[in-house]
Amino acid sequence: MYPEGNERMQKNAEFLASYIKDLTGKSLSVQAGTEGKGILLQLGGSSEKPEGYQLKVTDANVVISGPTEAGVFYGIQTLRKSIPVVQGMDIALPAVEISDYPRFSYRGAHLDVSRHFFPVDSVKRFIDMLALHNINRFHWHISDDQGWRIEIKSRPELTEIGSKRTETVIGHNTGKYDGQPYGGFYTQEEAKEIVAYAADRHITVIPEIDMPGHMQAALTAYPELGCTGGPYEVWKIWGISDDVLCAGNDETLKFIDDVLGEIIEIFPSEYIHVGGDECPKVRWKTCPKCQARIKALGIKGDKKHSAEAYLQSFIITHAEKFLNDKGRQIIGWDEILEGGLAPNSTVMSWRGESGGIEAAKQHHDVIMSPNTYLYFDYYQSKDVENEPEAIGGYLPIERVYSYEPMPKSLTPEEQKYIKGVQANLWTEYIPTFSQVECM
């Protein structure tokens, strides 16, 4: 039962009833109400945390309460984990009272669909896994060198050309290829469907358009946006391409605005991820347009950063201003620290914690996502011969659970900028969704 007139609580109730039906075969009625036997979902309770909840099981009923619909949903997840898989049998739950709340407001998980593409149903299943674990942010990596995966109507070549590669390297850049054309992308309507599906599970989808590096697929579609003018091809190997967006070309800025302008119409999230990682500067160093931009902006290199590193900050700041004007915020990988942070940016620290610590000291919000603890494309055991292929590394589940995201080197005031954590799944070596589930 759920509070009458509350659509989100009704969806919570329908979600739980559907789960119980699938798991046990038992059909529960879903109706508005505040009293009675059965499972009662209620707003209120004693939790002062917006995502907190109370779960109380007695011989009369089960009551899940919280100050928000999201809090109640997390209580539902705890109940889900208590229900045994018993098709056709009565369900017995022990009498219990649980009060709980999440430590961090941002609890994220990332899926790369550029290196390998996964259809809508698989993405929804990934979201279902996040919901079970009280994850409230889904970081969706939808563009990279190996494929552009989201429809941009003003730039149709991004998917007509940029979503397809001729073949894919076998293994770790062995020089051998599978000879099979590969592609796929999401229409805007499909992306909106996924956004709505996630929202019903109290998960916000954060899209990532990686820039100015990791743009080989986009350059294949629009070669005039690169420093050399191409020709380019959608990458069929893994790694980092030297070919990036030309920072001296005004058409690059228009391209960024066009893409982000459509992205914010699809994704209502506060954050838009702009990447900013692994952007080689070799093309910019010899590009007349980029060097002219450096001169026009009066950029000078120094002992800390090259002029080209400061030029990347110009691109990220341009994207931030565009998004801020539309009421959105940018988030980027910790490389956006190089050359100076854009004024309102949030840093996602993946190369260890140092980037996050530096950003917090500069009073910027931080999401901790260190590869040494939270990269799920690493091997889970040392028996690599009997594990699915991975990028390398070794990350057993014990190490994941041992992670403490609040650096002791920060003052209490600086620690306030650590907003949460995120696990990342890159898919160079993960071609199937069954392997996604395994990792």
Question: What spans do the regions from the language model cover?
Answer:
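Aromatic- and acidic-residue-enriched carbohydrate-binding clefts of CAZyme catalytic domains
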Residues: Q146-D200, M215-K254, R283-A307, S313
